[in-house]
Regions:
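Ligand-binding/active-site lining segments
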Residues: 20
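Charge-dense polyanion-binding interfaces
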Residues: 155-169
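Intrinsically disordered, low-complexity polar regions and short flexible loop motifs
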Residues: 138
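Active-site-proximal N-terminal segment of extracellular/periplasmic enzymes that hydrolyze or transfer
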Residues: 143-151
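C-terminal cap/loop subdomain of S1 sulfatases and analogous C-terminal strand-loop tails that border
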Residues: 1-17, 34-43, 48-135, 166-167
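Short glycine- and hydrophobic/aromatic-rich loop-to-beta-strand nucleating segment
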Residues: 26-28
Length: 169
């Protein structure tokens, strides 16, 4: 169906923290700087990385005192390299009585997620519904490996729940 095809057959839709709701293509055109037709499906970037990366490409300094979460991936955007993230990515998709959940129950994710290296943990802030995926091996999020990696679940849930508590206002 169109519903599943629009997210490249990944699990999830908008309003979900599964890959189908958060993974997006990014196109960039910069004639004479970037060779046309290049594709990079390996590097993991986030919107917060755009400001420091585009400033570096433009040859300008970030705003004085800037302490954002983004990393400079100018070489990745220019097609000169591929990069592994050095820091974790975290998401909170707030839930309340007004929130519209995805219609398909399989697309309804917990409201917190953290991506750390190849691991992606989804969990609710009360510790319920922990799901762990090795995104490099399972980008469709079909094989929850939380039971076989309790140490990873404990480490990542502590990080993302702490982040949520510090940033929920």
């Amino acid at each position: 169906s169109f519903q599943s095809a629009r997210a490249a057959y990944l699990r999830g839709t908008k309003n979900s923290l599964y890959e189908g709701g958060i993974r997006m293509p990014f196109l960039i055109k910069y004639p004479k700087k970037i060779k046309a037709g290049q594709v990079n499906n390996e590097s993991v970037l986030c919107a917060v990385d755009l400001y420091p990366s585009l400033c570096a490409i433009a040859g300008i300094e970030t705003e004085k005192g800037y302490q954002g979460d983004g990393q400079n991936y100018d070489k990745v955007l220019l097609g000169k390299s591929k990069a592994k993230r050095k820091t974790d990515l975290m998401w909170d998709f707030g839930r309340n009585q007004f929130f519209k959940k995805p219609g398909n129950a399989n697309d309804r994710s917990p409201h917190l997620a953290i991506r750390s290296g190849n691991w992606k943990l989804l969990i609710n802030s009360d510790g319920s519904d922990a799901q762990l995926y090795d995104i490099e091996k399972d980008k469709f999020e079909k094989n929850d490996v939380a039971q076989s990696h309790p140490e990873v679940v404990a480490k990542l849930s502590k990080k993302v729940c702490k982040w949520f508590e510090e940033n929920k206002d």
